[in-house]
Design a protein with these regions (language model features):
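Bacterial N-terminal signal peptides that target proteins for export
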Residues: 2-12
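Bacterial N-terminal signal peptides
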Residues: 11-21
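Metal-dependent amide/peptide-bond hydrolase catalytic core
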Residues: 24-141
Length: 141
């Protein structure tokens, strides 16, 4: 006679092992927002550009975290304006320690990309022009 317990135990063990293997890999999504003063390309020529800062940041992310996936890139609102904002998401995978290390690298890349855009336009951190913050600022959530 067939014992149901002898069938259930191996199946349960296999299911448990598969679940444990899946639980080892984790994912994290970072939402990056970059803002600057923006402006019209004629009257505000030379202002920092949030889309340019995002592009610089994404290129640096690609170098420092090659397996990261950058998605949902948005920014600017017109062909003749200097973008005041840019947003993108970074998808990371790995265990907890790897995620922390990758998130730190993404943060460093975004900081470096934004600093590069500020430096390219000769803007110092905290500088004010025409009553507005003149530099690129960023957040990661």
């Amino acid at each position: 006679m067939l014992n149901i317990r002898t069938l259930i135990r191996p199946a349960a063990a296999l299911l448990l092992a598969a679940s444990a293997a899946c639980a080892m890999a984790a994912g994290q999504t970072l939402a990056v927002s970059i803002i600057g003063p923006g402006g019209h390309s004629n009257g505000n020529y030379g202002h920092v550009n949030a889309v340019h800062a995002a592009a610089r940041s994404i290129m640096l992310i690609e170098k420092s975290v090659p397996d990261a996936v950058v998605t949902a890139v948005t920014g600017g609102n017109s062909v003749n304006s200097i973008a005041a904002y840019a947003n993108f998401r970074v998808l990371l995978e790995g265990d907890d320690a790897a995620l922390k290390a990758k998130a730190d690298k993404v943060k460093a890349a975004v900081e470096e990309g934004c600093k590069a855009e500020n430096a390219f336009r000769g803007v110092k951190t905290g500088e004010v022009r025409d009553g507005l913050a003149a530099d690129i600022r960023w957040t990661i959530k």
